[in-house]
Amino acid sequence: MEIFEKAKPILDRLIKNGFEAYFVGGCVRDKLLNRTIGDIDIATSALPEEVMSIFPKTVPTGLQHGTVLVIQNSEPYEITTFRTESTYYDFRRPSEVTFVKSIEEDLKRRDFTMNSIAMTTKNEIIDPFNGTIDLYDGLIKCVGEAKERFQEDALRMLRGIRFVSQLDFRLHDETFNAIKSNKQLIENIAIERISVEIEKMLIGKSPKKGIELLIQTNLVNHLPSLKEYTNQFNDLLELPIQSLKTIEEIWALILYKCNSDNPEQVLRNWKMSNSRMKQIVKIYNLLNETKMKWSNTKLYQVGLPDAIKYERLQCVINHIDANEFNENSLKNLYNQLPIYSKSDICITGNDLLEWSQLKGGPWLKEVLSEIELQIVENQLENNQLAVKEWFINWLQK
């Protein structure tokens, strides 16, 4: 069933109870653009407590902002009361929210015209700020005064640039100039929120457009760990980065171009998780090695996914589209490995202890590592008889 059809009974129920209800925001925008639709957002004239009285399964996720989560057929739907927002404090949050009865008033508080479009259950469009025109013109334009929108929530500056990259759009002149004159406000925003927008921008359809705007508006000089590397960040524009598939590849490339002495600290400044940081630094370190020759041991140690990322990045660094890299030869080499991890080895440390009648110690780890290496390099068959014979010879040395 189409996603709007599944949500339609919720709006019908609100309307049946005497309230207005509309689809709003990103879901309407993406429908008009024929893009994949994520979450469905619903706006209504019903107050939060009225919404909760109408539906049997609700979660009061943000009552102070008028938001209630309604569970319908095991699907969660966010329903928010029409509202206006007063003066913002700390360039992030409104100091006061006022519930209103007009959808037009509600749409007025939103960031960009393309996100200020509402739709009825009959697919009728309510568009007081001509968002559909801007949408079809490929234009990111603020609702009302751009400067005011960014002073309300400074993250909107990055959201605008992120949308340029994701949709391959362009910024309206007033929106661009307002970002340029309010760029320093981004320093009031939590790095976790900034990171989400930057990463969506970097893996968008047109990441170069996004990077170019970060530089042109000078926003880049107010982002952690990037202001020292503006020139190197600019170098990314010369490379076919749009051909990279994962955010880990892109972060490794950024670190490589910046020639960072302390990549862990750079990523830590972006509040990266330890596991993710470890993966990115691994790829970064591979890039700093001499041109890789894929022996059995090297491919076994690196693993196929990271080996492919490395080769794709080598293409991009050499100004070649990453999609030119043919993964099949690397996959074939990997598939011929006798084992893929330690757990594939046919014996354990307990076997060695039993065969040798020795006590455990540092020697055990060393011998297991040597057996692993011998098997990977096809110098030793991965079966108990062969390994036992090799081990007895080792004991006699």
Give a label for each model feature.
Residues M1-K397:
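Catalytic cores of the polymerase beta-like nucleotidyltransferase superfamily
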